[in-house]
Amino acid sequence: MKIIAKKDLFINDEIRVREVRLVGLEGEQLGIKPLSEAQSLADASNVDLVLIQPQAVPPVAKLMDYGKFKFEYQKKQKEQRKKQSVVTVKEVRLSPVIDKGDFETKLRNGRKFLEKGNKVKVSIRFKGRMITHKEIGAKVLADFAEATQDIAIIEQRAKMDGRQMFMQLAPISDNK
């Protein structure tokens, strides 16, 4: 049973329905009970009555220690946030007239970024009259993509944006 967000839960006296489908401490079904009987069962067991599915017909309420539940819920959320990995986009800037050695250095940097799980935006800035030779820039980007095809896929093909041509690569492991 999926439990909704903690701020949407009604507890004990906050519950305003006539009858509830009651779930016990161990998750067993106790049947449909009037609210007063469910509340007295909760008081007798020294636990809280928590409305966990208010939109169901009849609404579902569970006997539980709300303080403990809230603590476990927050702990679980914290663990999930820890496990989340943030994918950043790193940029490698090239020139349409880049030399082989410089290209190899930029390629090595791009490969490092991809191996760490980051996406790589490869951009070429055209200066002055270079803009008339867009095919040279496209060839440089194609060479970069070909050199990284074993560890990356092209997420966004080469495209012009003003005086800049760029493409985006993503590590293969992210897309499996």
UniProtKB/Swiss-Prot annotation:
Pfam families assigned: IF3_C, IF3_N
Against SUPFAM superfamilies, the record matches this protein to:
Translation initiation factor IF3, C-terminal domain, Translation initiation factor IF3, N-terminal domain
Q: Which GO terms describe its cellular component?
A: cytosol; membrane
GO MF, one example: translation initiation factor activity
List keywords of the entry alphabetically. Answer: Cytoplasm, Initiation factor, Protein biosynthesis
The alphabetized list of GO BP terms reads: ribosome disassembly
InterPro entries tied to this protein: T_IF-3_C_sf, T_IF-3_N_sf, Translation_initiation_fac3_CS, Translation_initiation_fac_3, Translation_initiation_fac_3_C, Translation_initiation_fac_3_N
Disulphide-bridged cysteine pairs: none
Write down the superkingdom of origin.
Answer: Bacteria
Its main subcellular localisation, reduced to a broad class, is cytoplasm
Q: Where in the cell is it found?
A: Cytoplasm
Decide whether keyword Cell membrane is in the record.
Answer: no
Per the entry, what this protein does is:
IF-3 binds to the 30S ribosomal subunit and shifts the equilibrium between 70S ribosomes and their 50S and 30S subunits in favor of the free subunits, thus enhancing the availability of 30S subunits on which protein synthesis initiation begins.
Quaternary structure and interacting proteins, as annotated:
Monomer.
Q: So what family is this one in?
A: Belongs to the IF-3 family.
PANTHER family attached here? Answer: TRANSLATION INITIATION FACTOR IF-3, TRANSLATION INITIATION FACTOR IF-3, MITOCHONDRIAL
Specify the protein name: Translation initiation factor IF-3
Q: Which organism is it from?
A: Streptococcus pyogenes serotype M4 (strain MGAS10750)
Organism ancestry: Bacteria, Bacillati, Bacillota, Bacilli, Lactobacillales
